[in-house]
């Protein structure tokens, strides 16, 4: 009995001294992709208890140091409209706001864009947008996806 416990204790000791479990150690991910996952959030807009819009946003200023030195707040945003034929935010009359301020620009990003390929979360159905806002001197950034009928999805990011 003591021999079994001793072997179990020694085995446990060697196993616990090994590498700690990390979700990304089984995948080949570069630093940008890993940070992209860390600074990406998702929310939904529900209508009649069913998902109508899926909204993802990645705060790019936290992902890449080069971006954080600019005077802009940059987000890579993905939007999927569940029950709509068109996936375009403008055709569906949606807009973005950051702390109630409109963006400087909204650019459509193609899925094969090499600059953002490692940040795109394999969303084959929705569309991606690069949304630029003027820099804000606040601690919390709240990006909103809003339509004309006051349906809103919002995500909060720390600056």
Where in this protein do the model-derived segments appear?
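Sec-dependent signal peptide recognition
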Residues: 2-8
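C-terminal motif of bacterial Sec signal peptides marking the signal peptidase cleavage site
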Residues: 13-16
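Bacterial signal peptide processing site
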Residues: 18-21
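Short, low-complexity, disordered segments immediately C-terminal to signal peptides
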Residues: 23-31
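Post-signal-peptide N-terminal segment of Sec-exported extracytoplasmic proteins
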Residues: 37-69
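Mid-length scaffold segments of soluble, non-membrane domains
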Residues: 65-111
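Short, solvent-exposed, Trp/other aromatic-anchored flexible loops in extracytoplasmic proteins
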Residues: 101-149
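Edge beta-strands of extracellular beta-sandwich domains
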Residues: 151-159
């Amino acid at each position: 009995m003591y021999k079994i416990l001793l072997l179990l204790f020694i085995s446990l000791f060697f196993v616990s001294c090994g590498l700690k479990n990390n979700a990304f150690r089984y995948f080949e991910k570069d630093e940008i992709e890993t940070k992209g996952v860390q600074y990406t959030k998702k929310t939904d807009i529900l209508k009649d208890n069913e998902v109508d819009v899926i909204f993802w946003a990645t705060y790019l200023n936290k992902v890449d140091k080069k971006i954080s030195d600019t005077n802009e707040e940059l987000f890579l945003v993905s939007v999927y409209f569940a029950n709509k034929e068109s996936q375009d935010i403008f055709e569906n009359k949606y807009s973005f706001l950051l702390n109630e301020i409109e963006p400087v620009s909204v650019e459509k990003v193609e899925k094969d864009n090499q600059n953002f390929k490692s940040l795109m979360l394999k969303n084959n159905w929705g569309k991606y947008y690069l949304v630029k806002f003027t820099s804000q001197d606040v601690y919390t950034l709240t990006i909103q996806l809003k339509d004309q009928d006051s349906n809103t999805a919002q995500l909060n990011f720390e600056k």
